[in-house]
């Protein structure tokens, strides 16, 4: 990942969460996500300045649920999956990556002093009882085949048991950090 990714990730998460909490009277919308992302860009720039690190970056994926509406936004290669028991996979975010000399390069992310690359893709969905939403980093989805990931998401087991399976597979297969 990016330099100081954990620091950048915490700054972005805290800024978006704070913006959402401070604006509960504003309905979820593309504009609300964009404004939260601007706050996150400012936060990562300030954190970079405070720590004398010119460069730090992170990806982001989020969901906000109001009633039966889910607003999903992401920047980078962190993903959101939306599955419905009767229909399977309804939606998966599209990674913001390009291949450069055989390497995957994240083309959009929160990166210090580069707010122009922190442009989120935003989608809204009507959700139903029983729908499953998974937010995860590339360290999780690259650790298992897509059919295994989806099967675990639709499993009737308690959430903790499903997360234990994800944790086991990531530790066994993965060489990347995961959330």
Over which residues does each language-model region extend?
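PP2C/PPM-type serine/threonine phosphatase catalytic domain
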Residues: 1-179
């Amino acid at each position: 990942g990016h330099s100081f990714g954990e620091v950048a990730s915490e700054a972005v998460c805290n800024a978006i969460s704070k913006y959402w909490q401070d604006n509960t009277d504003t309905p979820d919308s593309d504009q609300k996500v964009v404004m939260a992302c601007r706050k996150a860009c400012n936060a990562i720039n300030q954190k970079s300045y405070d720590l004398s690190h010119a460069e730090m970056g992170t990806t982001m994926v989020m969901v906000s649920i109001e009633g039966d509406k889910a607003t999903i936004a992401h920047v980078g290669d962190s993903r959101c999956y939306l599955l419905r028991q009767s229909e399977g996979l309804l939606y998966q975010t599209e990674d913001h990556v390009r291949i450069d000399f055989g390497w995957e390069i994240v083309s959009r992310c929160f990166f210090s002093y580069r707010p122009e690359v922190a442009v989120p893709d935003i989608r809204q969905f009507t959700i139903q009882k029983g729908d499953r939403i998974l937010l995860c980093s590339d360290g999780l989805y690259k650790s298992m085949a897509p059919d295994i990931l989806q099967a675990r998401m639709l499993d009737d087991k308690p959430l903790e048991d499903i997360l234990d399976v994800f944790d086991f597979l990531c530790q066994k297969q993965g060489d990347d950090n995961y959330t």
